Structure formats: C-alpha cells, structure tokens
Curated annotation (Swiss-Prot):
Protein name: Ubiquitin-conjugating enzyme E2 2
CC annotations in GO: chromosome, telomeric region; cytoplasm; HULC complex; MUB1-RAD6-UBR2 ubiquitin ligase complex; nucleus; Rad6-Rad18 complex; RAD6-UBR2 ubiquitin ligase complex; UBR1-RAD6 ubiquitin ligase complex
Disulfide bonds: none
Single Gene Ontology MF annotation: ATP binding
Region annotated Disordered, chain positions: 1-26
This protein's encoding gene: ubc2
Assigned keywords, A-Z: ATP-binding, Chromatin regulator, Cytoplasm, DNA damage, DNA repair, Nucleotide-binding, Nucleus, Sporulation, Transcription, Transcription regulation, Transferase, Ubl conjugation pathway
Entry function: Catalyzes the covalent attachment of ubiquitin to other proteins. Plays a role in transcription regulation by catalyzing the monoubiquitination of histone H2B to form H2BK123ub1. H2BK123ub1 gives a specific tag for epigenetic transcriptional activation and is also a prerequisite for H3K4me and H3K79me formation. Also involved in postreplication repair of UV-damaged DNA, in N-end rule-dependent protein degradation and in sporulation.
Uppermost EC category: transferase
Length: 151
C-alpha cells in the first residue's frame, strides 16, 4: 500500500543514504517503513563523545503532518529524556513542521545532547545536576556512554 507517508519516508531514507548527516544514521526495519532504527553518535568535545545511542522512530500515516514518536533504546541520562527513553523536544511536539525529515530530527536530537533545555526537564535529577553540579552530571553521562557500547 503506497501512501503519502510511505512515499515521504522512502524519500527520507534515500536522503539518509545519499547525504547522511555527520554522526547519525537511520533506516526502516525490515518489511516496515513506518518503524525505523536510528543511531546517534555522541558529539565530539562533549560529555557524550564516543557514545553510540540507539533510538527507535515510529511514524503514523499522518507523517509528515504529524511528528514521529522517538525513543532512546539505549540508556540515556539527560535533562530532556524521560526514564522511558522518550524525549521532551519542541520539534517533536508543538514546534513540529512537515518540512522536518528524519535527518533533521536526528541532528536536532544530537544537538540537544550538549545543549539541554533545563527550563522544562523530563529528568529533574539530570537537570539539577547539569545546573548545580556539572562535574557529577558529566560523570553520570560518561557512565551512560560506556553502557552505550554494550547495547
């Protein structure tokens, strides 16, 4: 069944293959273009450096008019990531635009890693450490980086 969402996702996939953004990758799971596996590499010169963080993206038939659900599969200690792995990111909610594609979503998440929004935290502990005890925050992040290699 060919829908506009599926056609758009195939275009997104083609772009990820031909012009991949640095430090991110994604592709549909076998036999289901509506579910994607993705990987974000922790940005250099950040506490997340060298981390390999796995995510899953779920698209509905309303895509690109409705944002996908995005969730970290890898453990993540970050002010804007819930314990469930779900993200609190404005472009996946009230600031969504149909012009965003998979590459834009993943690069936004990658940028969020080192530039969290502490005014609206999903993980209060991570947010408080980020603001008040950066050394401990970095230690906890580095622990998740090491765990990401085992996932």
């Amino acid at each position: 069944m060919s829908t506009s969402a599926r056609r758009r996702l195939m275009r997104d996939f083609k772009r990820m293959q031909t012009d991949p953004p640095a430090g991110v990758s994604a592709s549909p799971v076998a036999d289901n273009v509506m579910t994607w596996n993705a990987v974000i590499i922790g940005p250099a010169d950040t506490p997340f450096e060298d981390g390999t963080f796995r995510l899953v993206m779920h698209f509905e038939e309303q895509y690109p008019n409705k944002p996908p659900g995005v969730k970290f599969i890898s453990q993540m200690f970050h002010p804007n990531v819930y314990g469930t792995g779900e993200l609190c990111l404005d472009i996946l909610q009230n600031r969504w635009s149909p012009t965003y594609d998979v590459a834009a979503i993943l690069t936004s998440i990658q940028s969020l890693l080192n530039d969290p929004n502490t005014s609206s935290p999903a993980n209060v502990e991570a947010s408080n450490l980020y603001k008040d005890n950066r050394k401990e925050y970095i230690k906890r992040v580095r622990e998740t980086v090491e765990k990401s290699w085992e996932d």
